[in-house]
Amino acid sequence: MIKGSKAMIETINQYSKTFKEPIRKSRTSCRGIVIKDNKILLVHELNKDVYMSPGGGVEQGESFEQCCRRELMEEAGLDVSVGEHLFTINEYVFDELFISNYFLCEVVGVGEMALTPTEIDHGVTPEWVDVEKAIEIFSHYKEKTPDHESLYLREYTVLNKFLEQ
C-alpha cells in the first residue's frame, strides 16, 4: 500500500475461537488513528481497564467520515480532519460480525466531549499513550476475556500494520 493512496484498503478477517455461525447481528463502525509526538490517542474505559481506538457505530444516513469525526468529538473532544481509510477489520465473535473501518486522522481543533450514559458508566477517558506502550498493552490480548481478547487483537493488529507502512 502506498501512503497517501486511497486505492487500496487492506481488509483483515479475524475469527474468535468463540465464533459460531450463523451470524445473527452485525455492526459497522469507524475508528480514528491519531498520532501526535509519538503518542497515539486511545480511549480508556477506566471501570474495565480496557483501551481501544476512539470510534463507534455508523448511524443511519451517516458517511464513514462523518461517523469518524462525530465519534472523535464525542469521545475525545477533538475536531479532526479524516484522512486515508487504512484498514477494515471484520471481527467474527460469538454469532456477531463487527466491521471496523480505521482512518488516519489529524487534530484540527478542540471542542466538547459528549459521552453517552454507557460511556460515562464505563469511565471513558481519552488518553495520549506512547506508541510503544500501546503496542505492549494490546499485546496481552490472550490474557483477556473472549470479547476483550478480540478487541485487543484487533487493536494490536491495526497498530502493528499501521507502523509497518
Where are the predicted features?
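Conserved Nudix-box catalytic region and its N-terminal flanking loop in Nudix hydrolases
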Residues: 35-74
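Residue-level detector of beta-propeller blades
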Residues: 45, 82-85
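Acidic, metal-coordinating catalytic segment for phosphate/diphosphate chemistry
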Residues: 2-31
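Unchanged
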Residues: 58-81, 90-141
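Nudix hydrolase/Nudix homology domain
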Residues: 49, 120-165
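Active-site beta-strand termini and strand-to-loop segments that position acidic
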Residues: 34-37, 105-107
